[in-house]
């Protein structure tokens, strides 16, 4: 990546610590609001509706009730252009342009504000793509489609950049995340399922070569006095495997099924759960969302509300003792939302469990006769997230290039507001980083 290497040589750069949980939703919303996930009321891609066991919803732009940087800039009369920042559907009304994100429903046409811009955007990109089906065995197709998607995104970015002299321009590109999920085991010899496949390794390398080229083409349009910053909301690492949270809860007597064990890969919602004998159940993903079956809250609750804290502590102790197939401790770390966040709004899980510093995914499906899986239970996946993302500030004002101090993702929003001379709302929890830009 020669262009990025050249930029790095005149940048301040370092690690950007993500949030709990280190997931795209809520991390980008935290970054640009300066407010933690609990206060925002967003804890991941899926949230359980109150009063149900399995009814779920995906957060949208309207879920975020706190203003983000572009909202405050818009109120101040600044012109903004935002591309793909999640959650971004439906596109919020801003003083400028907002193009929706990868969570946009298939077939949606209302993905850009103002709507009058859509025909031009479609023409420039030959159809604006939002994401690629990346958890699939056909890696060659995945690689080709990711390269094409990212090229179209950058074509849109060049088109939008050239429309007017924006005060603030932000572009989110989901492609690198997808490349990691689909191809990590082909370029990392330390991956537990490493495959020496030159063609697939080459696809990953081709993606990054293309990305470097596209970054260069976009920045060639940017005047030298414009501040350029690269940010990521989380890092990536090899996926070690999956821990079957519901299989474990069954083994401990906290979750009870009726009848014989279900076939492998059975979702919990399709299993015969005996809720009258169940104290807790879990959901899969980058971390385990654990819910308690509480009387008066769940339809068939078994735990008294006064028992919840003690039961959570018991589960935490039991999870801490879990060992991997190699005999080593799994490294389960349990977080209770009310102890982690300033506030707990929205529909939070009762417990959040990370496994092996999030190197192990949580599998919510059943029927394996084992607590561990080598592969993801919802489709092929080579990588998971990590807490350390990156920042890179090109040509920092103070001239201090090279490695910089570790920073916190939640501090980016107030730092940008300070840079623009805007007051920082009193409920913002992050702090401006000085110097940074």
How should these model regions be labeled?
Residues 355-413:
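Low-complexity, glycine/alanine/valine/leucine- and proline-rich hydrophobic stretches
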């Amino acid at each position: 990546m020669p262009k990025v290497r050249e930029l790095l040589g005149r940048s301040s750069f370092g690690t950007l610590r993500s949030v709990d949980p280190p997931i795209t939703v809520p991390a980008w919303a935290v970054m640009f609001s300066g407010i933690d996930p609990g206060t925002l009321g967003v804890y991941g891609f899926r949230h359980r509706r109150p009063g149900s066991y399995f009814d779920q919803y995906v957060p949208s732009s309207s879920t975020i009730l706190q203003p983000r940087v572009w909202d405050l800039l818009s109120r101040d009369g600044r012109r903004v252009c935002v591309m793909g920042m999640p959650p971004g559907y439906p596109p919020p009304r801003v003083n400028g342009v907002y193009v929706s994100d990868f969570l946009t429903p298939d077939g949606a046409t209302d993905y850009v504000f103002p709507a009058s811009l859509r025909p031009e955007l479609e023409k420039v990109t030959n159809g604006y793509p939002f994401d690629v089906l990346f958890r699939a065995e056909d890696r060659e197709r995945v690689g080709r489609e990711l390269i094409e998607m990212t090229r179209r995104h950058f074509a849109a970015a060049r088109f939008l950049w050239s429309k007017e002299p924006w005060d603030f321009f932000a572009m989110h590109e989901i492609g690198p995340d997808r490349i990691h999920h689909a191809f990590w085991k082909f370029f990392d010899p330390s991956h537990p399922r490493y495959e020496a496949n030159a063609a697939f390794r080459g696809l990953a390398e081709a993606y990054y070569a293309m990305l470097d080229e596209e970054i260069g083409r976009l920045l060639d349009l940017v005047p030298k006095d414009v501040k350029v910053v690269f940010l990521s909301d989380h890092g990536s690492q090899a996926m070690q495997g999956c821990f079957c949270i519901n299989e474990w809860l069954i083994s401990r007597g906290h979750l009870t099924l009726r009848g014989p064990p279900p076939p492998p890969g059975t979702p919990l919602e399709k299993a015969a759960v005996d809720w009258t004998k169940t104290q807790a159940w879990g959901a899969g993903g980058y971390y385990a969302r654990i819910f308690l079956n509480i009387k008066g809250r769940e339809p068939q609750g078994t735990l008294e509300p006064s028992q919840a804290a003690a039961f959570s502590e018991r589960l935490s102790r039991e999870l801490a003792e879990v060992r991997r197939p190699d005999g080593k401790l799994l490294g389960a770390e349990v977080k209770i939302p009310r102890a982690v966040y300033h506030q707990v709004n929205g529909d939070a899980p009762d417990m959040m469990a990370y496994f092996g510093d999030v190197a192990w995914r949580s599998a919510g499906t059943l029927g394996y006769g084992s607590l561990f899986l080598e592969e993801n239970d919802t489709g092929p996946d080579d990588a998971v997230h990590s807490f350390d993302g990156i920042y890179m500030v090109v040509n920092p004002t103070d001239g201090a290039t090279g490695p910089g101090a570790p920073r916190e993702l939640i501090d980016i929003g107030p730092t940008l507001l300070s840079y623009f001379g805007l007051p920082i709302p009193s409920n913002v929890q992050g702090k401006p980083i000085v110097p940074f830009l």
